[in-house]
A protein has these predicted regions:
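Conserved catalytic/acceptor-binding region of the Class I
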Residues: 119-120, 126-202, 221
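Conserved class I S-adenosyl-L-methionine
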Residues: 1-36, 47-55, 71-74, 78, ...
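Conserved hydrophobic residues forming the short capping helix/wall of the S-adenosyl-L-methionine
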Residues: 56, 79, 156, 181, ...
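Conserved Class I S-adenosyl-L-methionine
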Residues: 3-7, 19, 45-47, 169-266
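Class I SAM-dependent methyltransferase SAM/SAH-binding core
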Residues: 37-96, 120
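A short SAM/SAH-binding and catalytic strip from SAM-dependent methyltransferases
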Residues: 104-118, 141
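A short acidic, Gly/Pro-enriched loop at the edge of an enzyme's catalytic core
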Residues: 94-105
């Protein structure tokens, strides 16, 4: 799981184990058709765009946009290796650089919860989709559906006084989610609960990566020197030894994941 480039680690480790299978779920829900123009918002390394491009065919168009240039660089390389014609742009979801009605379909996989202004991002997706077009997105259900991560979050809060994962699971309330989409102008909102099990190789590396990612943005962690950060990491790892063993089957961590897959019309 180790890499000097987090985007490459994401593509090589997280996409095959988690985000690739969930991309298939999202694309099946969206049902892209030949000739359609499709936008993948907060595309990351582009797995959703890569799943869609052959479905819309040579008469269609697929564009991926993300704020992270390192993610986009990996997305471009992956698409080139696979011989896929996808356009990549850098930019924020809250200010999409496209004209009104430029797309038939907008997709967004596990990113809405991270946007600084979720409603603004949805309004932008609404704006760039033509009347009669549609949106499909996925968000994780709440921490109550993810006990391993709830335990990890409790361990992080004990050591650092602040949550490390609650944003990831912040849109589990279906009423809030529906109101958010409707307030952005979408109609006929359908929310489907979907569950899937993921198998992560190398349990020790998996936990180390989760701790690194989930504590990186916490101010109290950032203010520590290297030795103190290592001490916090070791303490959290010790707290998680029993939950990690319980989730380990052979050489893999096996965890259930629960999401809401949303489809709505423009």
């Amino acid at each position: 799981m180790s890499s000097t480039n987090p985007a490459e680690t994401y593509e090589s480790y997280m996409v095959p184990t988690l985000f690739g299978p969930w991309a298939d779920v999202l694309v099946r829900s969206a049902q892209p058709r030949p000739g359609e123009r499709v936008l993948d918002v907060a595309c990351g390394t582009g797995i959703v765009a890569r799943r869609v491009v052959n479905l819309v065919g040579s008469d269609g168009q697929v564009v991926g946009i993300d704020l992270n240039p390192n993610m986009l660089a990996v997305a471009r390389s992956a698409a080139e290796r696979e011989g896929l014609a996808i356009e990549w742009q850098e930019g924020p979801a809250e200010r999409l650089p496209f004209p009104d009605g430029a797309f038939d379909l907008s997709l967004c996989q596990f990113a809405l919860m991270f946007f600084a202004d979720r409603r603004a991002a949805l309004q932008e997706m609404h704006r760039v989709v033509r009347p009669g077009g549609r949106i499909a997105l996925s968000v994780w259900q709440g921490l109550d559906h993810h006990p391993f991560y709830r335990t990890l979050d409790e361990a992080i809060q004990r050591r650092l006084g602040m949550s490390g994962v609650q944003d990831i699971f912040a849109l589990g309330d279906t009423k809030e989610l529906r109101m958010l989409l409707e307030s952005a102008g979408f109609r006929a909102v359908e929310i489907e609960p979907v569950a899937m099990t993921a198998r992560f190789p190398n349990p020790v590396a998996f936990l180390a990566g989760e701790i690194d990612v989930d504590t990186a943005a916490i101010p109290s962690m950032q203010h520590l020197d290297a030795e103190a950060r290592r001490g916090v990491t070791v303490a959290i790892r010790e707290d998680m030894e029993r939950p990690l063993r319980a989730a380990t089957e052979g050489e893999h961590v096996v965890l259930p994941f629960h999401a809401h897959v949303v489809r709505a019309d423009r």
